[in-house]
Amino acid sequence: MKLSEKIAAIESGEYAVIWTTPAGSIMKAADYGPYYVVYRNGEPLGAIDSPDDLDTFAAANHYTA
């Protein structure tokens, strides 16, 4: 499952997915409406505005479903 699909499927009220990279970084992607905010170890890295770009970011940062 792509990260964008996983976030879209969450029904808990907080639309976020957290995973750990092989290097030990804790990654988080949160859906804030028109964009996603991505974090590494609690620090914001930036905003991503499309599901395709989010999935590219996720693949580059070792996200696995």
Regions found by a protein language model. Name each.
Residues S12-A59:
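Acidic, low-complexity, intrinsically disordered interaction modules
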Residues M1-L3, N61-A65:
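Short intrinsically disordered terminal tails
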Residues L3-K6, L54:
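Short amphipathic alpha-helical segments that mediate assembly, nucleic-acid/protein binding
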